[in-house]
Each structure stands twice: as C-alpha cells, then as structure tokens.
Design a protein with these regions (language model features):
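Hydrophobic alpha-helical hairpins/lids featuring a short glycine-rich hinge
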Residues: 68-138
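Structural signature of hydrophobic alpha-helical transmembrane segments
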Residues: 1-11, 100, 292-293, 356-366
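Alpha-helical membrane segments and immediately flanking helix-loop junctions
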Residues: 135-193, 320-408
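Transmembrane helical segments that form the transport core of multi-pass membrane transport proteins
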Residues: 253-344
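Long, contiguous bundles of hydrophobic transmembrane helices that form the permeation core
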Residues: 207-258
C-alpha cells in the first residue's frame, strides 16, 4: 500500500506540472521520460542497490571526515566553545550553530575553490555534463549549468553563464534558473549535515536534482527554439585566481559572505516567525485557538500532500509544516526546525526522515525569486523583464523537483 501511494504521489506531481505547462502539446516525451527514468535510476542506485548504497555510505563517511577538519580552524578561533566539552557542560545540548555550522561553510567553500583551481571540479563537471547532455537530449549550456549546481549555489550561477546569457534562448534561461533553485550548493550541504541531516540523503538529493530540475523545467516551459550557444572553453570564475593560495583565500572570503548571509537571514527569520506566531496565537486565543501557529497552519494545509508523497498520516502534519516553512521562508530555517527530530532516535521512522530530508533539499522558496531575478538581471539588464516573468514559474518547477525526489526516495526506502 505504501509503495503504491508513492507511485500515485509521483503521478500527482507530474499531473500538477502538466496542468501548469505553458505549451502542453510541445512537451518532449523523449527528454521528460529520460529525465524521470534517470532520476529514478539515481535514486534506486544510491538508496536501494547494495553496491550503490555502500558507495554513498563511504562518500558520506569521507565527507564527515573532511567536515571534522573544519573543527581545527574553529577551535583555533573559538577554543573550547567547539568540541565535546560543550556537550558535557550543557548535558548534550552544547551544539552552537554559530560555532559549528558557519565555520564549516567557510572551510568547504575554500576547499571547493581550491579544487576548481587545480582542475578537479572542472573535469568532473565536464564529464557529468556530457553524460546528461546525451542522456537527456538537452543543450550543452543546460547540462553545464545543471551539473554545476552540485557545487555552486544560485548566487554563483549567473556569473558562470554571463558570457552566454544574451545568446541563451528563453527555455535555456528558464532551465538555468530552475536548476539553481532545485539544488543546493556543496557548501550549504555541509551546513545542513552539521545540523544532523543524513549526508547520504543530501548527496542523493543533489544528484537527483540534476535530471529532476530539467524534467520539470521541460514540462512547465517546453523547448521550441534551437540553442544558439556555442563555446569551447568553460570558465568557472570571472577573475580566475593566480595561485593556489589566492584560490583558497578567495574561497574563504566567499564562504564568509555566505556564512554571514546565512546567520543574518536565520536570525531575522526565526525572530520574525516568533513575532508572527505571537500575533497569530494572540488572535487565535480570542476564539479558543491559543496554540495555533504558522507551523501548524502549514501543517494542516500541506499534510495531504506529504501523505500522498509517502509520509505516514501520523507524521504528515509535521512534514507539511516543514515543507511549508521551506517554501515560504527558506530551507535553512526548515532544516533548523527539523533538526531536533533527528537528534532523538525513534521520534520519526527512517522513511519519514528520508522524505523530509529530500523535500527540503533545495533553494526553492519565495525569497529565491528575488535573489535570482536580481542576480541574473544584474548581468543582463536588457533581459530583466523576461527573467522576472520566469521567476514564479521556475519556483513551481523547482519545488515540484524537490518533492519528486522526496517521493522517489520514500519509494525506495519503503522497498528496503
């Protein structure tokens, strides 16, 4: 029954996308079918197929090992505020977001910048981009951007496509925006893992987001124009560093900006949510609903969607609430509120944890529309009106992409 519910959930998400399509007759079944099959295949290999699961587990262990090295830099600055002594002092509650998550973001961003400089990232993106281009029958620029989103966030993508944006057709531009919203950057992945989200789920979600973002981009905005973009040399930075030291330093400074942005937004939004909940609870108290909150409203509204995706009804309210928070606020706040449920074993079953982890794994939220429109418009002012028109539709495509990955994850976890 649970397996069939997951299958129905996939069909429902595809049906929603079809209803939102601007040109239903021009949908490429070749690309859409290949993207869906590839997304399912990636999910199956990484979550169900024993050798694939083993490989993901080993990769997760490796990432955790790399993450542990960030504590050396954190401890040098913050001393005993980082490490097991804090857990002893506060009886297991010594995890301090500012000292554990934010430094990891800075460290990993510097590491990614260094790997770009020595050519590792470029080679990997070229190989994966070529595979996805041929498998999905899409243009080179689309596959290039989609694969790049594994490592870079939606803030960096506009700089990457800057040399080509004026030659990109409307559908390529839409796909680039969708791919950025549907994914997470490598540095942010480490931040989420630092809050207890299983790293193997984050890895699988990042890879599944590549075909999934293209899948829903192609349904909501069908490709009707030939690609005009041709290039030989791909650049990953507007001003390439001159040395490995400069690459690491530039990456660290970029990481600092990201970490500062994350801290600022999280502080502001957590406070705003508390204010809204205070107002809602106060007004609700006049009518006998003193316990009503923004989270509970999201939960009631989106619980049926969470259930059709495969979450047990007993947990559907929580899942719906977190999905709503991710969409209306951002994924970091949603993961922050999800984190306590991950710290206590037995609170949620494995399948529910997987579905929620996948559903929240993406930049698709209303705030991202402003980020994307502002960033892309800055590098191509003449296309600003066109980019603004694509924002809301891209958010819908990216959200459906994340939910599809979550539903597929629930399907394979249910089979295991």
């Amino acid at each position: 029954m649970d397996i069939m519910r997951s299958v129905v959930g996939m069909v429902v998400l595809l049906a929603i996308a079809f209803l939102l399509s601007v040109n239903k007759k021009s949908i490429s079944l070749r690309t859409v079918g290949a993207a869906l099959l590839l997304q399912i295949a990636i999910g199956g290999i990484m979550l169900y197929f024993p050798p694939g699961k083993w490989a993901v587990e080993q990769a997760a262990l490796g990432i955790h090992k790399v993450m542990s090295y960030s504590d050396a830099g954190s401890a040098f600055i913050f001393g005993s505020l980082v490490g097991p002594k804090m857990d002893v002092l506060f009886d297991g509650a010594g995890f301090i977001f500012a000292f554990r998550v934010l430094p990891a973001i800075i460290f990993v961003t510097a590491l990614i910048s260094l790997l770009y400089y020595i050519g590792v990232m470029g080679l990997l993106i070229r190989i994966l981009g070529s595979i996805f281009q041929k498998a999905l029958n899409i243009s080179k620029i689309e596959s290039f951007v989609a694969v790049t989103t594994i490592f870079l966030g939606q803030n960096e993508i506009p700089a990457i496509v800057k040399p080509f944006i004026d030659r990109m057709n409307r559908n390529e531009l839409f796909t680039a925006i969708c791919s950025g919203m549907a994914s997470i950057a490598g540095s942010m992945m480490i931040g989420y893992a630092g809050m207890g989200v299983p790293i193997d789920y984050l890895l699988a979600a990042s890879l599944m987001a590549i075909p999934s973002g293209i899948l829903f981009a192609r349904i909501l905005s069908t490709a009707t124009e030939p690609s005009q973009v041709t290039f030989e040399n791909l650049s990953f930075s507007e001003t390439p560093p001159k040395s490995i030291i400069e690459a690491a330093a530039n990456g660290a400074m970029t990481g600092l900006k990201i970490a500062a942005g994350v801290a600022t937004v999280v502080m502001a939004f957590v406070a705003i949510i508390a204010l809204i909940n205070g107002i809602i609870g106060g007004v609700g108290g006049w009518f006998g609903f003193a316990n009503v909150s923004l989270e509970s409203i999201f939960g009631y509204v989106l619980a049926p969607l969470a259930w059709i995706m495969g979450v047990d009804w007993s947990d559907a309210n929580l899942a719906g609430s977190l999905i709503g928070q991710k969409l209306a606020i951002n994924e970091f706040v949603a993961y922050l509120n999800f984190s306590p449920y991950l710290q206590t074993s037995g609170t949620l079953d494995v399948k529910t944890i997987a579905i929620i982890s996948f559903a929240l794994c993406g930049f698709a939220n209303f705030g991202s529309i402003g980020v994307v429109v502002g960033a892309f418009s800055a590098i191509s002012p003449k296309r600003a009106p066109e980019i603004a028109q694509l924002g809301l539709r891209a958010l819908a495509a990216a959200t459906l992409s994340n939910l599809m990955s979550a539903t597929i994850a629930g399907f394979f976890i249910g089979l295991a």
